[in-house]
Amino acid sequence: MADSSFDVVSKVDRQEVDNALNQAAKELSTRFDFRGTDTTIAWKGEEAIEIVSSTEERVKAAVDVFKEKLVRRDISMKAFDAGDPQASGKTYKVSGTLKQGISSEDAKKITKLIRDEGPKGVKAQIQGDEIRVSSKKRDDLQAVIALLKGADLDVALQFVNYR
């Protein structure tokens, strides 16, 4: 019997983030407490989002609205990293980035967790910004998925190419 395997990745569906951003922008334009504050939310490059408002409280509230929209679209909060509000002239800005890929140190933590706490006979290999987990038994792979879902890691994980 051939080995079964799956890949552990950390990727965010950009279209879902774009939908959440558009929903947040629409809500910010119609909400009463944001009237007259010139609050905007927009893409800044490929992986960055910028939120601008007239006061620090409004920019923090706009970040909360955006995070709420991300959660409703099943995007993990671990995938979005928002900075602190910064004053620039008469406005306040928050720049946030989307985290894509598993860093080498996080990959090492995950493979160590699989080796230490996972079932015997499961192999985890780091392949760039993803991890390939393989085993002879599919039940062992399902146990590893449950282990990783239950672990408190700093990165949002998805499981793809399950074969």
Swiss-Prot record:
Molecular function, one GO term: nucleotide binding
PANTHER family tied to this protein: UPF0234 PROTEIN YAJQ
Matching CDD domains: YajQ_like (cd11740)
Keywords for the protein's UniProt record, in alphabetical order: Nucleotide-binding
Membrane-crossing residue ranges in chain numbering: none
Entry protein name: Nucleotide-binding protein Mvan_0997
Example of a GO cellular component annotation carried by this entry: cytosol
Keyword Mitochondrion in annotation: no
Biological source species: Mycolicibacterium vanbaalenii (strain DSM 7251 / JCM 13017 / BCRC 16820 / KCTC 9966 / NRRL B-24157 / PYR-1)
Family classification: Belongs to the YajQ family.
Family matches, as Pfam families: DUF520 (PF04461)
Role: Nucleotide-binding protein.
The keyword Signal is annotated on this UniProt entry: no
